[in-house]
Amino acid sequence: MGDDPADGRRGLNRSLDFAGSIENTYICGMLPTLRQLQYLKFLAEHGSFGRAAEAAHVTQPTLSAGIQELERTLGAPVVDRARSGVILTAVGEEALRRATVILNEAEELVEAAKNAGQPLTGRFRLGVIPTIAPFLLPIALPLLRERFPKLRLFLREDLTQRLIASLKAGLLDAALIALPYDMNGLNWAHVSDDELFAAVPADSVLAGKESATPEELEREGLILLEDGHCLREHALAACGLKPPKAADEENFAATSLPTLVQMVGSGLGVTFLPGMAVEAGLARAAPVAVRRIEAAHPSREIVVAWRAGSNRGVEGKLLAETLRTR
């Protein structure tokens, strides 16, 4: 049997009814409380009223009553209740998405009020990409502790795409990332330019030269980080090279720079290393030679980024300024 058009109309009407209920709620001055939104967040995270109540440090009846009040305010159920636990409805999913942003903004408000006139004090959530974290943080963290003793730094290491998504969602205050990258909706401050080098087997012909051309590196067989690591795109773009064929990448790819160095040292091919990794001595972990790349601008730009319009912009600039003086 075909789809019943009435089902589509009922779904559309349901959406319109929900939108209408939101509008009517606003007009009547009935808005969800932050506590109710927190209850919804705990419920989504823990999957049951009992565990959510424990996480919220309230009784189960209190949390249940808060969710019911939220549903009355929104004019629609936010969860489906079952013996196996609770599942968010479509309305609940949308409410949770918006609640997450609202709760993060509320936390930012509290932190901003506490730290007014005292930047980089209190909680600060900083994201760092994997090709920066192990090389910059050992230098940066002691410096930040010395200059900002009241700073409580929470670090998250992840790929650029996910860090930017977290910035825009208000889950991070700033992130140390590398450009070029699509920075729509973000502001940033320059930290440094990081030159890219070629890492080749110590017994290879290229090891006997002072520098290598992109074409020479390509002929030796490129080994790159897995797709998603921005260093991969930066190096290829700087050298004017195309990504290796999919069939080749299935055999030779890595998830970290230390693994790449070991693969090069074993004679599997050549790769690119950022200058900060070379300075940290990463290439000394295997029989590898580091050579300059004969290209116009074989480098990436290290920046501190934050969400456009965020009140953390002043602190983002101060963080970048501090890291520039390291």
What are these regions (language model features)?
Residues 159-164, 168-172, 177-178, 228-289:
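Hydrophobic hinge/microswitch elements
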Residues 185-222, 316:
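Flexible hinge/capping segments at coil-to-helix
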